[in-house]
Amino acid sequence: MYRTALRPSQSALRAIRSTTSPSALVSSGARRFASTTSAPKKKSTWKGAAVRWGLAVAAVYYYNTSPIFSDELPETAGTAPSQLTDADLPTVDAIVEEKRRQAAEHAAARKAAQAAAKAAATPATPSESVEEQITKAEAEAEAVPEGDSKPRSESTEGVIPEAGASPEALQEEADAQGAFNPETGEINWDCPCLGGMAHGPCGEEFKAAFSCFVYSTEEPKGMDCIEKFSHMQDCFRKYPEVYGAELADDEEAERASAAAPAAEGTPAKEEPVENKKEEALEPATHDATAANNNKKQQ
């Protein structure tokens, strides 16, 4: 029974050995490629070698320069912030002190602005009283020698007139100090010879009356300006705290003019019209000369 089973297996092994032997493989290969011929080998040229070397160099260069194959991360645009210490950080006390300092500065600036506004709004007041002006005038008159015939306007040229000066004296001082330009007809209201009266509460009335007197062509001078001087005096009475000295001069002039007719035995109502007109011509800054005349009459 076993012999009949081994015989077919031995015949199969022999067939496999015969097909896998080297001689069988060579013969089978010869039979398979008998109709074909081997392809001839092509000779390489220098152009192909140059192309191959160029491609190799380009690949190496791209590998070394491309960021794709780089191991390091690219640098960021911004730099890292520096480390802060505790000394650099502001404390609560420092912040409170800074706020207090700023508040004090704002308060000081506000007070300075208010003081400047008050100073600008306060009108200019005469710096000297009538008594001081009269005393100065008498001292100057005594200082001048008797034989000196030089006019007073020339000896006091360039000096600011007193607050009690008459319109004629103001005009002379204005002409001497260049406040009035006769060629152009302009009046410099900022001239110190006017005593700052053009910038007070009644500055407009003073400008109107003084300019009318300067440009007046009537005889006696200023006869056509009586109404304007009356308006100016009415304005002075509204501000007695500013023009108190000028109002006192006007009252003294009125008392002197009223006492003169009584001393002569004539009634006060018969006072000449010219005296009344001269009284109306007295501006805000006059009249020291009237006070001197009153003393001489007494």
Swiss-Prot record:
Membrane topology of the entry: Single-pass type II membrane protein
One Gene Ontology biological process: protein import into mitochondrial intermembrane space
Cell compartment(s), UniProt: Mitochondrion inner membrane
Cystine crosslinks: 191-193, 202-235, 212-225
GO cellular component: mitochondrial inner membrane; mitochondrial intermembrane space
Coiled coil ranges: none
Position of sequence motif Cx9C motif 2: 225-235
Biased composition, class Low complexity, residue ranges: 110-121, 256-266
Region (Disordered): 101-159, 248-298
Keywords: Disulfide bond, Membrane, Mitochondrion, Mitochondrion inner membrane, Oxidoreductase, Protein transport, Redox-active center, Signal-anchor, Transit peptide, Translocation, Transmembrane, Transmembrane helix, Transport
Domain CHCH: 199-243
GO molecular function: protein-disulfide reductase activity
Cofactor note: Cu(2+) or Zn(2+).
Transit peptide: 1-33
InterPro entries: CHCH, CHCHD4
Any single Pfam family the record assigns to this protein: CHCH
Transmembrane segments: 53-69
Function text: Required for the import and folding of small cysteine-containing proteins (small Tim) in the mitochondrial intermembrane space (IMS). Forms a redox cycle with ERV1 that involves a disulfide relay system. Precursor proteins to be imported into the IMS are translocated in their reduced form into the mitochondria. The oxidized form of MIA40 forms a transient intermolecular disulfide bridge with the reduced precursor protein, resulting in oxidation of the precursor protein that now contains an intramolecular disulfide bond and is able to undergo folding in the IMS.
Name of the protein in its database record: Mitochondrial intermembrane space import and assembly protein 40
Native organism: Neurospora crassa (strain ATCC 24698 / 74-OR23-1A / CBS 708.71 / DSM 1257 / FGSC 987)
